[in-house]
Regions:
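Short glycine-/polar-rich loops that comprise or flank the Walker A/P-loop
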Residues: 12-13, 91, 124-127
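A short acidic (Asp/Glu
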Residues: 26-28, 105-109
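Short, basic/hydrophobic alpha-helical segments
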Residues: 76-94
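Extended, low-complexity cationic-aromatic segments
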Residues: 1-82
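Short, solvent-exposed loop/turn segments at secondary-structure junctions
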Residues: 20-24, 58-61, 100-103, 134-136, ...
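Acidic/histidine-rich, metal-coordinating catalytic segments
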Residues: 91-104, 131-134, 139
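RNase H-like polynucleotidyl transferase catalytic core
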Residues: 39-47, 115-140, 157
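C-terminal anion-handling pockets and recognition modules
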Residues: 11-15, 138-188
């Protein structure tokens, strides 16, 4: 077993698939059956409401973590990294993510340089590896977002506020253990 694999198995180093998602109030919409030939009326609230989430999927445990943000940008990405470091108590992390422009921004790079303190790559606190360009199918966090939105759609009749939609979305993601097996390991 290599030193890197041993560090991952011993949980000294985490491998996290990271992504951002915009949850919209409309994501909770479902279908309803009604009498044939009659229009069914349902009360509507603001369909424009949305919440941005950053998420991280631990590839070893299958556990996902969500973090709400006002939007997806460089500042929020740095804040998310800080939240990850607090949550995972400063353990080393390999971040697998897409090539969004703010992932490559000067602000994010400056934060990574500060955290990694110019050390050898094998000792970096946070190491970022990009998925192939325009290949969201490589990132299992995309499937986690879909599972959360699907769960919300299945309970749409019980969700009367956007706050309830957000709570249901996050609760489903954080209580589920995701198993992607081959999808994760085809990347390596």
């Amino acid at each position: 077993m290599t030193a890197a694999a041993a560090a991952i198995v011993s949980r000294q180093q985490l491998v996290l698939c990271v992504d951002e998602c915009h949850l919209h109030w409309g994501d909770a919409l479902g279908y309803v059956w009604g009498p044939q030939g009659k229009r069914v009326s349902l009360p509507m609230t603001n369909g424009q409401e949305r919440q941005t989430y950053y998420g991280a999927l631990d590839v070893l445990t299958g556990r996902a973590f969500t973090w709400s943000a006002p939007g997806g940008d460089s500042d929020q990405t740095v804040r998310f990294f800080k939240a990850l470091r607090r949550r995972f108590q400063g353990r080393r992390m390999v971040i697998l993510w897409d090539g969004a422009s703010y992932h490559r921004s000067a602000e994010v790079q400056a934060y990574l340089q500060q955290v990694n303190a110019g050390g050898a790559e094998t000792a970096w606190r946070i190491q970022c590896v990009m998925f192939a360009p325009y290949a969201p199918q490589q990132n299992p966090m995309e499937d986690v977002w879909l599972a959360g939105k699907t769960a919300v759609r299945r309970m749409w009749q019980t969700l009367s506020t956007f706050a309830e939609v957000k709570q249901g979305f996050c609760a489903h993601i954080e209580k589920t253990i995701f198993q992607f097996g081959e999808k994760i390991f085809h990347f390596f």
